Amino acid sequence: MARDEHDSRYLTAELPGTGGLFKETPEDFLVEEISLYLPCGEGEHTYAVIEKRGITTLEAIRRLCRATGAPERDTGYAGMKDARGITRQTVSLPRVTPAEVMGLNIPGIRILSADRHRNKLRLGHLAGNRFRLRLRETVPDAADRARAILDVLARRGVPNRFGEQRYGIQGNSHLVGRAMLAGDWRGAVDLLMGDPAKVEGERWRAAIEAYRQGDLAGSLSLFPGHCRTERDVLQRLAKRPDDFERAVHGVHPRLKKLYLSACQSALFDRVLETRLQTIDHVMEGDLAWKHDNGACFLVTDAKAEAPRAERFEISPTGPLFGCRMTSPEGEPAALEKSILDAAGLTPAAFNLAGGLRMEGERRPLRVPLEGPELSCEEEDLVLRFSLPRGSYATAVLREVMKRPGNGA
């Protein structure tokens, strides 16, 4: 489940990429949520459209809650966004007036609008995302190359991979999740503390080395203040040095869910890699995804369903494994079982206590690319397109750029 295993193949392998650099400045990456609905104008929650820069969604929520006094547990958001780039998204704040929100002045956050609504905004309550991406230092014929690749993606679909941004700054969030699912709590703590080769700053590296040498107090004193998770875990471990499970449960519940979700994502990506060249075809035994309503059905006659797949009405699905996930049959089922077995997990492993139970669901192996546009601005190549909720622009960039290690 190492990261490089997810970056080995392309759907458009026969087409050369643009190369180039991405995310050199925040303005290179702009994402705007496409809302499912607008606030109704009444209720105890304020829906605020924010523009955040250089901070994660969770950090934006922390800052909003500190500024308004709203409890984090009652604050809602539709989608998780990372720190790099500029994001426009909606968050809901309980028992705070729109006027109070509009009057906020918070570093890294600009309030664009605020209105009342009756209920908390829930994860997944968005139609999709619009992206504007700027690529720098591309090859001279980058526009022609990108156009050819986008044409294929528009016809065959975008591989619905999660990709490396799902695995955290050190690229091991999925491994933390797998250790938790396997009940390897010491392994989870070791991974949480990090790898000194993957962090910046002598103090941070020294903190990790101190932990590895068993010096918990020394490690705690060295970890920088922004390493909140590591410090919380160490504080618990210092009180009970052998209780690694208790230490892991010092992690914020949202973060624990993220680690588990990252493991699900890595396993899905592995299935996708195996089926990459046939993501626009269904096979017998598949659970096919209906793009008009998100329902799934068992494919019993692949030949009969082929025209619907060609029209992009349906697509094969892959697993977000869980204790109650519906499994396919036949060859697709055998493939998915082999990948779960290789990870040393079973469906029952996802039935965790403490609000961490992962029931599982199906996810389409491909998604439609909506409204792709290309433009050349000075010496840069600018891409614009939309994707459904839960799908990532990096899946498009990876095909377009074909350069490892550039964030795509």
Swiss-Prot record:
Domain of life of the native organism: Bacteria
Domain TRUD residues, every copy: 157-367
EC category: isomerase
Coiled coil: none
tRNA processing listed as a keyword: yes
EC identifiers of the protein: 5.4.99.27
A GO term, aspect molecular function: pseudouridine synthase activity
Sorted UniProt keywords: Isomerase, tRNA processing
Gene Ontology terms describing biological process: pseudouridine synthesis; tRNA pseudouridine synthesis
Catalytic residues (positions): 82
Pfam families for this protein: TruD
HAMAP family according to UniProt: TruD
Function, in words: Responsible for synthesis of pseudouridine from uracil-13 in transfer RNAs.
Protein name, UniProt field: tRNA pseudouridine synthase D
Gene: truD
